[in-house]
Amino acid sequence: MGTVNGEYEDFDAANRRAEVIDWLGGLLPEFDLPLDSSDEELRDYLINGEALCYVADKLMPGVLEGTWGGYASDQRSNVKKFLSVVAEMGLPGFGVKDLEEGSMSSIVECLLALKDNVATQLGGHISNSTAKTPIRRKLELRETDGPVLSVATPGKRYPKSQQRSPLLSGQKINEVVQFKHGTYTDLPAAKISEMLHSNSLDNAPTQSLLRVVNGILDESIERKRGEIPHRVVHLLRNVIQEIEHRIGIQADHIRNQNSIIKTREDKYRSKIKALETLVNGTNEENEMAINRLEVVKVEKSKIDEKRKLGEQDMIRLIREKENAENIIASLHQEMQVMNRMHEQFREQMETKARQMEEHLTLRAKEAEFCLMQSKKKVEEVEATSQLKSQLWSKKANIFQSFMNNQKLSIKDIKISSQSIKQEMYALQMTWRDEISNIGHDLKGLVDAAENYHKVLAENQKLFNEVQELKGNIRVYCRVRPFLPGQDGKLTAIDYIGENGEILIANPSKQGKEGYRMFKFNKVFGTHSSQAEVFSDIQPLIRSVLDGFNVCIFAYGQTGSGKTYTMSGPGTSREDWGVNYRALNDLFDISLSRKNAFSYEVGVQMVEIYNEQVRDLLSNDIAQKRLGIWSTSQPNGLVVPDASLHPVKSTSDVLDLMEIGQSNRAVGSTALNERSSRSHSILTVHVRGLDVKNGSTSRGCLHLIDLAGSERVERSEATGDRLKEAQHINKSLSALGDVIFSLAQKNAHVPYRNSKLTQVLQSSLGGQAKTLMFVQINPDIESYSETISTLKFAERVSGVELGAARSNREGKDIKELLEQVASLKDTIARKDMEIEQLQLLKSKSPNSMTDRNGSNLLRQSTSSTGLSSLPVASQQNQQLSGSVEAEAEDNASDDGCSVGETEYSPAGASETSAERAHKAPSRITRFFLTKNGQPSTSRPKPREVVPKTQGSMRPGTAQATGGSLAKPSKRR
């Protein structure tokens, strides 16, 4: 009985759901669900609430717009709007959770109730409209103020003449409905005739037609006389006929639906009665059948399980059979092999048996002979044993007497041991008390040691901050481990402390005089890895992204591991040196800051070989020689003619570094098989742009691998190696002079004595963070070089450069720099024109030159438009005076521009193109002051420096008050 009732309930629910789907299909054109759709399919279509809101708006236009503001993006809001409309109508609703995950019966009941309510209202309007006049219907419409509901016939479609077209219904009838500025009597007859002859009334919505009727009736009531023009009456008659036609169609549809529903109800009642009769008569049979069915189901499930188990057993047996067959085949093959081996073994054993038989026969004869001899020996042994037994009996008597004496001694020892135990117990108690006192004292020592380490760490942090504020050159010392095969050598390193101490032992002296202690910022022992070394300098390198200039260089004798520390022995990640790790770290940080900052990274790699600067990343490295800027430039370039390669990732850096290392000058000496014969300089330029405020920052990282200092008698250098060693020692000596001058705070620092010190001028001269790696050899043979290197490092650690400054430029400074660049370009063009005029003047007569020159100058002035530049006229006059003064200074000098080295042969004349190339150097007096404002003041007199042994010209360019003085010529 329960099963039948359940089936009937499912059947009834399916019919009601199909009825709802049929009704929604008539209302919504895009509703395409089949009538036999499940609850889940209907739920998926209605769950967002838009279809429910569309149904409510379709049945009652404007009910959502005035109250709720249209559809919402949230599905719960749409469903709540629909439920509010249903509640206002007094119809049963449903819960939001029922629509999301509950039963669909409540949703179906709600929609059917809404359908019945709409059909009831529509039937009442039809009966009233057929019995009353148009004026009465119009007045009732005003009283009820309810919308006329139009429900499409489900399962049917209007004919082509009645299908709604948005274009047709939106053009003709809307012009009449929205005619507000005039009256309907003012409508022209041609427009009304066009509407009547076309299908505009057929395609127009019922609401629009009712508005037309209401408008005409309102107009007639307002006139009070009731006079309506004939054309308007004709229009009104057609509109009313169309409305009555539509209402009739709706009434026919409702009657058809009612008859269909009654027929279905009669069928369902008869089926219900028959089912009730059948159910009442066959309850017991149903129960028995159900029980049997359950038993059959259980047996069927068991049979299915057995069948599945049998199939699994069959599959398993088949697999086992296949495995057994494979095993049998392999065993058969093995058996054949074993048979063959057995035959061979049997033959070998037979041969061995014959040999053993012959051997045993010989052994038997030998055994018989030995037996005869053994019998003789037994007789001799028996005689000797009797003698020995007599001796042992005598010894036993002696031992017995000895044992008696020992027992007496043991008694005495036991008595003494008791006394000793008592004494030991007393000592243990004394020791226990002393140990407890020692533990208490030791705990105090441990606490004091912990506090000592904390205070030591704080002091180290404060010391680093003081060093940062003072701008001291950080000095890190690294001890090279012994090379393979040198483990047996003596070392000069006696002790390495945790706080930067290193103790050097002198093998030729004894006692305290044989030891020398040095202290630096950090000392790395022989077992320190590349990662440990880089972790200590990582914060220093990261400050490059904040706009600081950083310089890291390695100093030490040949073979002390400078190139190992800076570049590493190979390209594997574990062997990376400071160069690779620094650039990789910069890329990682720039990637993490990409939302706030945009960074551009460029790489230069040059070497100083025999006092010549060469580009290691250029193809013509052997021919091209580069000059050095003697002053710090706004773009941070020290060697501007060297190729600057932009890099985007670590792989780009690896490729460039591999090219640079292959082009670097190396050679073999007695101290190092692959000795660096030049100073390698890797310069990383980082330009940052703040995405928010547009400010820029510029940082420069110099990674310098100095060539090793060496003694000629130890390196056994000759020929080119000797010349290279002389240049290397000379440049390192010049570096020592610079360090000594900085340590003494002299007014003049001899940067110009070497190309190396010129490159390091921007780093050693302040406004930069500088770090020096001191590389030393541990062997005792290099003691003198080690002491010399550590003394130099100790002197460097005392140099104070002042606090480093960040190179940041605001948006205003950036605009001023752009204006300066445009002025430089304009003045460069003017210089070229002036030089052309001078050439014309030297070639042509004076009269022709003056006339033509004035015309040419007038034309060039008008063409360039110098007066339109955004600079005051007073600044232009000062700038022109500065340019003229600069031209006079250059005329008195040898024509070498800023940062350029003169390589042209003596007596060679410069072409106009070369002078044009050097022309921008004449405007270097147009500079930015400290507050970011442009200035064109004259430079102060140059500092005159006496000539040194390096044949350097005096007049080093000095930056005074923000202006750039004229550089001098260098060779």
From Swiss-Prot:
One of its GO terms (biological process) is microtubule-based process. GO terms for cellular component: microtubule; microtubule cytoskeleton. Residues 272-357, 809-844 form a coiled coil. Residues 472-799 form the Kinesin motor domain. It comes from the Eukaryota. Residues 14-119 form the Calponin-homology (CH) domain. SUPFAM superfamilies: Calponin-homology domain, CH-domain, P-loop containing nucleoside triphosphate hydrolases. Residues 839-881 have a biased composition (Polar residues). PROSITE patterns: CH, KINESIN_MOTOR_2. Residues 839-971 are annotated as: Disordered. ATP binds at G556, Q557, T558, G559, S560, G561, K562, T563. One of its GO terms (molecular function) is ATP binding. Keywords: ATP-binding, Coiled coil, Microtubule, Motor protein, Nucleotide-binding. Pfam families: CH (PF00307), Kinesin (PF00225). InterPro entries: CH_dom, CH_dom_sf, Kinesin-like_fam, Kinesin_motor_dom, Kinesin_motor_dom_sf, P-loop_NTPase. Belongs to the TRAFAC class myosin-kinesin ATPase superfamily. Kinesin family. KIN-14 subfamily. This is Kinesin-like protein KIN-14C. The gene is KIN14C.
